[in-house]
Amino acid sequence: MKILVYGNQKFSDYDTFTRAVVVAIDNANGATTDDSRLDIYTAGPYKINQFTAEFVNKTEGFFKQKGIKSRFYRVLKNDVVENFDKYDIDTVVYLSTKNDRSEIFDTVISEAENNNIPVSVYKV
């Protein structure tokens, strides 16, 4: 399964990040034929990239016990928008603060919706 995680500069709640990723994994489970891999693509900003690295490092042993190889990749948001089909994403997670309204016009969310990819938006 492949999950894209990204957000805005002000997002800084690790607990919400963890919940969002776990829900995305649960929802994407069985969506692809290769459930022996968990690829999390992180398109930033820096704090969300850090959260992704921490999450994968902390859960690596658990996933390994389940026979799942977990990895994360840092990607550029613009590259994801331009080459969305190349990434073969199963679900998209957007993390923001409550006063951020940019997801209404976000290009990644629009691209995901155009490709019938589930999108989850979490605001703190």
Name each model feature, range by range.
Residues 1-16:
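Glycine-rich phosphate-binding "P-loop"
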Residues 12-124:
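Acidic/glycine-enriched connector segments
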